[in-house]
From Swiss-Prot:
Subunit and partners: NDH-1 is composed of 14 different subunits. Subunits NuoA, H, J, K, L, M, N constitute the membrane sector of the complex.
Protein's name according to its UniProt entry: NADH-quinone oxidoreductase subunit K
Family: Belongs to the complex I subunit 4L family.
Stored HAMAP family: NDH1_NuoK (MF_01456)
Any Pfam family: Oxidored_q2
Molecular function terms from GO: NADH:ubiquinone reductase (non-electrogenic) activity; quinone binding
NCBIfam families: PRK05715.1-2, PRK05715.1-3, PRK05715.1-5
Name of the gene this protein is made from: nuoK
Organism, scientific name: Anaeromyxobacter sp. (strain K)
Keywords for this protein: Cell inner membrane, Cell membrane, Membrane, NAD, Quinone, Translocase, Transmembrane, Transmembrane helix, Transport, Ubiquinone
Cellular component GO terms held in the UniProt record: NADH dehydrogenase complex; plasma membrane
Amino acid sequence: MPVEYYLWLAAILFGIGLLGVLTKRNALILMMSVELMLNAANLTFLAFARRSGDLAGHAIAFFVIAVAAAEAAVGLAVVIAIYRSRGAINVDEVRVLSE
């Protein structure tokens, strides 16, 4: 399969993630959209690694997956803490720094 197909798929995934970040106000949806954008970036790294035959793209993708897992765990913990204290996870309704 040509590498361009992977790049088009990555662009579509990144666009869907960006659309979710720009239009949704639910914190969980925002986190999922950011994860989708990170996976699109990983797919791009892997596509270029496949084209060049280099393993650096695979190493970068593995590192990004590890960082994304840590980011998701911390983000989910923050969302749960905010929900327990405020009763909402909508980013427009929650103003953590003002109180």
